[in-house]
């Protein structure tokens, strides 16, 4: 009942891409690969026997991990002894075409990943496998192997006996009063004040008649790092909403986004500049 499997990620050498850019390649050589990047996976696989694992976006020394039989089969299964199924990261298979440029075709990117040992894919690169088998471009044995690995784990978890678990048991844990209180405590304690120059915080409202709130995150509910999927949720209070609620009519609040998260467009900047110039204080909410 209610059984799940953990999924270690991202295999492998994901944490130090060139220039700190997500997806960029990692350089290091064989010694660093084995002594540094493979070590945590080797230990976790040996000590906990995880039934699932996720690939990474990166290439190591120019070889895209997700499309490499050397990394995904020879090392992961042959050397480390991994027995579960491999799951792609979002878009990691498609990026064999769009980012790593090792093939001009999405279907071919899918074939490379499947043959390398990636059993389950998030994006659309596996959608045409039936046609590819019929055309002789893909050996069905790779599909059979992937399906066998996935179904084996599902049987081990008992998903065919109780596919939905016990909703009543889940409701006692998920969003229970105890867990909601704990989540709030964690969120409160996660806030980090890097610097409080001139002791500006907490704000002395007697000094400010107007405050500008600018930035792409100024009116978004971001509940954590990499939590972009919750940015438009109606549950929760945004920075702008919270300030307006607390300040009421005591302080004039001017708002402007100024820019988008990922864009080089400058059409919103003037509005933000105007809001800041007309205010006694600016609060800027940026970052992704």
Stretches with model-predicted labels:
Residues 1-288:
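Glycoside hydrolase catalytic-domain context in secreted enzymes
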């Amino acid at each position: 009942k209610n059984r799940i499997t953990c999924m270690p990620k991202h295999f492998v050498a994901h944490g130090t891409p060139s220039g700190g850019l997500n997806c960029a390649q990692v350089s290091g050589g064989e010694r660093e690969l084995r002594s540094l990047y493979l070590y945590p996976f080797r230990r976790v696989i040996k000590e906990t026997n995880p039934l699932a694992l996720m690939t990474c976006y990166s290439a190591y020394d120019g070889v895209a991990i997700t499309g490499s039989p050397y990394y995904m089969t020879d090392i992961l299964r042959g050397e480390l002894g991994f027995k579960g199924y491999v799951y792609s990261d979002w878009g990691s298979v498609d990026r064999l075409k769009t980012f790593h440029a090792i093939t001009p075709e999405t279907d071919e990117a899918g074939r490379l990943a499947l043959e390398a040992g990636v059993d389950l894919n998030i994006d659309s690169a596996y959608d045409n496998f039936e046609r590819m088998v019929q055309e002789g471009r893909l050996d069905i044995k790779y599909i059979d192997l992937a399906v066998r690995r996935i179904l084996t784990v599902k049987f081990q978890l008992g998903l065919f006996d109780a596919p939905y678990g016990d909703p009543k048991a889940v409701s006692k844990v998920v969003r229970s009063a105890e867990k909601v209180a704990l989540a709030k405590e964690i969120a409160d304690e996660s806030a980090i004040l890097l610097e409080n120059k001139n002791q500006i915080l907490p704000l002395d409202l007697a000094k400010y008649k107007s405050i500008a709130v600018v930035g792409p995150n100024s009116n978004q509910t971001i509940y954590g790092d990499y939590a972009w999927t919750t940015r438009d949720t109606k549950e929760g209070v945004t920075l702008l909403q919270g300030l307006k609620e607390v300040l009421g009519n005591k302080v004039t609040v001017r708002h402007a986004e100024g820019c988008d998260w990922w864009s080089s467009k400058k059409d919103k900047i003037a509005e933000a500049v105007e809001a800041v110039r007309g205010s006694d204080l600016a609060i800027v909410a940026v970052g992704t």
